[in-house]
């Protein structure tokens, strides 16, 4: 079994669509092995998104991710990373395929409802950023 990391972003929490996202995750065959609701500080968001530090959108991204609560998740299934990326859909909801979370619930490129690890290396950094082993069942 493979594990991946996911975040339900502040825009989705604000719009009360967390339950819809969780339903789509479970319908997609994922097992939720870790879940917590947290509010990132700007510093924590900067640490999490450090790989984008030199990108022009870094400041706006960190401000957005720290503006309200998020739901951090660890998902498990065979091919979890690729399957989660497929279920999320394209970054821009306008370009996402029907049946994906971003097509159904995304508002814009920034307010696109969810985040997901893009590789095993990313997952191995992102999961322990939010969870210790005792929190994963």
From Swiss-Prot:
MF-aspect GO terms: ATP binding; metal ion binding; nucleoside diphosphate kinase activity
Biological function: Major role in the synthesis of nucleoside triphosphates other than ATP. The ATP gamma phosphate is transferred to the NDP beta phosphate via a ping-pong mechanism, using a phosphorylated active-site intermediate.
Cofactor: Mg(2+)
Gene giving rise to this polypeptide: ndk
Compartment(s) where it occurs, according to its Swiss-Prot or TrEMBL record: Cytoplasm
Segments passing through the bilayer: none
Organism: Geobacter sp. (strain M21)
SUPFAM superfamilies per record: Nucleoside diphosphate kinase, NDK
GO biological process terms, semicolon-separated: CTP biosynthetic process; GTP biosynthetic process; UTP biosynthetic process
Residues at the active site: 115 (pros-phosphohistidine intermediate)
Protein name as annotated: Nucleoside diphosphate kinase
Binding residue positions for ATP: 9, 57, 85, 91, 102, 112
Enzyme Commission number: 2.7.4.6
Gene3D superfamilies tied to this protein: Nucleoside diphosphate kinase-like domain
Subunit relationships: Homotetramer.
Predominant place of localization: cytoplasm
GO CC entries: cytoplasm
Assigned keywords, A-Z: ATP-binding, Cytoplasm, Kinase, Magnesium, Metal-binding, Nucleotide metabolism, Nucleotide-binding, Phosphoprotein, Transferase
Reaction catalysis annotation: a 2'-deoxyribonucleoside 5'-diphosphate + ATP = a 2'-deoxyribonucleoside 5'-triphosphate + ADP; a ribonucleoside 5'-diphosphate + ATP = a ribonucleoside 5'-triphosphate + ADP
């Amino acid at each position: 079994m493979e594990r991946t990391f996911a975040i339900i972003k502040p825009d989705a929490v604000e719009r009360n669509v967390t339950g819809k996202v969780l339903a789509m995750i479970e319908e997609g065959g994922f097992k939720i092995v870790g879940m917590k609701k947290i509010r990132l500080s700007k510093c924590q968001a900067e640490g999490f998104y450090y790989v984008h530090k030199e990108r022009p959108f870094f400041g706006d991204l960190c401000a957005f991710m720290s503006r309200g609560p998020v739901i951090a998740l660890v998902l498990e299934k065979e091919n979890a990373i690729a399957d989660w990326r497929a279920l999320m859909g394209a970054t821009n909801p306008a370009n996402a395929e029907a049946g994906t979370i971003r097509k159904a619930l995304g508002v814009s490129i920034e307010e696109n409802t969810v985040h997901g690890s893009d590789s095993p290396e990313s997952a191995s950094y992102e999961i322990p950023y939010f969870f210790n082993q005792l929190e994963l069942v």
